[in-house]
Amino acid sequence: MTKHFQHSRRDLRERAFQALFAMEMGGDFLPASQFAYDYDKEAADDKQPSELPVFLLNLVNGVMDHKAELDEVIKKNLKTSWSIERLTVVDKTMLRLGLFEMTLFEETPDRVALNEIIEIAKKYSDDTSAKFINGLLSQFVSDESAAVTE
């Protein structure tokens, strides 16, 4: 049985990842975001595009607007034997999305954003990639977030 879209923040993050991935593969912003949002939604049966949630649009727009600076931060935090070009499109997209939400999107606590992107990585990548993403992004969990969860 297929799990249907729930409109939760996790599902919206997953849709943001899907839209960003499609854009990396040459897709346009609005069609990629709309498709990712409507694809397995039960409401998609009515053939009318749904209004895209602000949270989804903010994530996709934010990553695209800050893509160059996100890539620079990722490059600086890779081991010297790695380059950003060597990363898979899935991993690169996950890192950008997670890093954006943790460092530039103040709506979500760092630890929540980290946990969410790791869960999405487990679904779309393998365990090695999820661990890699966790290792790189865990450097950006602020002390303020750590104090709240302890």
Curated annotation (Swiss-Prot):
Please name the InterPro entries in this protein's record: NusB-like_sf (IPR035926), NusB_fam (IPR011605), NusB_RsmB_TIM44 (IPR006027)
Instruction: Give GO cellular component annotations, separated by semicolons.
Output: cytosol
Keywords, A to Z, come to: RNA-binding, Transcription, Transcription antitermination, Transcription regulation
GO process annotations (BP): DNA-templated transcription termination; transcription antitermination
Q: Name one GO molecular function term.
A: RNA binding
- Family classification: Belongs to the NusB family.
Q: What does this protein do?
A: Involved in transcription antitermination. Required for transcription of ribosomal RNA (rRNA) genes. Binds specifically to the boxA antiterminator sequence of the ribosomal RNA (rrn) operons.
What the entry lists under HAMAP family is as follows: NusB
The protein here is known as: Transcription antitermination protein NusB
Give the species this sequence originates from.
Streptococcus equi subsp. equi (strain 4047)
- Give the classification, highest ranks: Bacteria, Bacillati, Bacillota, Bacilli, Lactobacillales
Point out the gene that encodes the protein: nusB
